[in-house]
Structure formats: structure tokens, C-alpha cells
Amino acid sequence: MTTALTFNLQQFSTEDGPGIRTTVFMKGCSLRCAWCHNPEGLSPQRDLVWHDTRCIVEDPRQGTARECLRVCLENALTLTPGGMTIDRARCTVCGKCAEACPAAALEIIGKEWNAEELVAELLKDRVFYETSGGGITFGGGEPMMQSDFLCEVLPRCKDAHLHLALDTAGAVAWERYARVLDWVDLVMFDLKIMDSARYKRATGIANDLVLDNARRIANARKPMWIRTPVVPGYTADHANIAAIARFIRDELPMVERWDLLAYTNLGKPKYHRLDLSYALENVPLFTRDEMESVWRVAAEIAPVARWSGATR
């Protein structure tokens, strides 16, 4: 039986498809977007992180608080004046330190499921899906990187009459989509940048495959929601927004809505916990007027456009 690795099950989500949903965030992504707000979903492997606000190693009342250091057989943990450091070259992500930590300051990100286990967990909130017109959304990361697992879990979800959405960036081989689309009710598809060279600079790959997959999904007559992260210096210029709008209008007849998602810096602490650099470290949020301006450009060409997100 195939298993999957997830980094979160977000219950009572109202932003990842219609109604009240559970979003299954699957680990592993084929892109490296500079603005990614879920960097814990990039690696297909488990990650170890340290939460400074939870740590109690300096609390004299906690006699066992340094057990994390003692149980690490690889000597990958070091307590410094600045906090706990993780030698990621040594760490095997065995999880012993996280198990020993009484404050959950050390955490393993990545939970393994088989299809039967995951469906049983998802069905716990079935009443909320049914009363709200909601269901399950598979996102990430890039859920299509674990398409073998989706081929097992999606039919089980369909047997339970659940509405299924797929949140994808489109940067995987079409053959993977062809295997799962029959079970999917809605495809939420990311369109970030229309110029291929700019797309590659921002994400690590060209966008030819992405655009081709978007067309194929539309040709398969699957309802689509388009999502565009509006990011300063990357995607937010009016020329790019207008180009995406024309692509939606001219080539994606199945698009029901287009969400312009205002840049958020909420992912910044996650980068620090993973010892990753964050390219947008000092970039401020948009103002409401700036987002309204972007939306007007989009809506003039593609009236299905809307925007959401925090502003300053």
C-alpha cells in the first residue's frame, strides 16, 4: 500500500475551495518560488524544526528539559546563547529529540499516512462538509508529486461522496494529472507569471509545462479556479496581471473564479526555523489601494477576478 507524507491537515478551512473543507497539505514541491509561505512543504522528506518561543531549556524548574540533547546519538543539537542549533548535515530526522522534548519545542514536520488512515481522519468532519457544501482539498507543496497515493485515496473519498479539490501549481508531467482527474471535482490552478524567463527566475523552472497543463485541464472540462499570488517585484506588475487575464479569457473557458492573493509575510518565521534564507525578508505588505489597482487591471479583462488577503 502506498503511503503519503503530509505537513498539515487544516480543518475548517474556508479558503481552499467551496464550503468548509479539510485541506491536506502534502510534502514535496517541484517549484522553489521565492515568496513561498509554506517552506516546510518544499522537501519531500521529513524536517526537524525548533520553536524558540516554546523552548524551556533555560528554565531551572525543568530538570529534564535538556533530554533532547542527551538522546541525540548524532550530536546534531547544540545549545548556544542564541538558542538551539541543528546540524542538518548530521541530523537523521529520527525524531528522538522531538519525542523527548517536554515543551514540543522540537518538532518533526511530516506525518506518514496510508489511504485508509487518512480517509478515516477526514471523515471525522463529514457533517461540516455536507452542511456547507464543502469537502476535501489536496494541496501542498505539490500534491501531484505524490500522485500514486492520490490514485489510492481519491477513489476512497469518492466512495464516501466527498467533494474533492486539487490545488496544484501545474509543474508536473501531464500523465500524473490524467491518472487522477476523473475523481476530482475542482482544480485550483496557480498561474503566477506568463513570461517564461521571468517564471524560471522566480520558481526555478520555465512555465511551458504549466501553461500546457492548464490548457489540458480546461479541455478535460474540469471546473477551475485560478490562483495568482500577487508578489512585489515578481508577479504584481500590471503587464503580467493583464497577460494572465488574457490567457484565462482566451484559453481557459472552464475558469469559474480567479483569486488574486495578496502577498503575505507570515511564512518568514518558518524559513528561520528551517535554516533557510528568505528572499523577501524586508518586503512590506501591499496597501489596499495597491491591491485594488491590480484587481481592476485583472477584472477589466477577466471579470471572474477577485482579490483577498491582508494589507497594510
Task: Indicate where each model-derived feature is located.
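Conserved Radical SAM active-site core
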Residues: L42-W183
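N-terminal cysteine/histidine-rich coordination modules
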Residues: M1-S43, D47
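Electropositive phosphate-/nucleotide-binding environments in soluble metabolic enzymes
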Residues: T23, K27, V49, R66, ...
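Auxiliary Fe-S-binding modules of radical SAM enzymes
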Residues: M1-P18, A218, V230-R312
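Short glycine-enriched, charge-decorated loop/helix-capping segments at active-site entrances
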Residues: W50-T53, K200-A206, D275-V283
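Pocket-edge positions in alpha/beta enzyme catalytic cores
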Residues: D47, G83, G110, E142, ...
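Conserved AdoMet/S-adenosylmethionine-binding subsite of the radical SAM
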Residues: E116-R273
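Glycine/serine-rich loop-strand microenvironments at binding/catalytic pocket rims
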Residues: K27, L31-P39, Q45-R46, A76-I108, ...
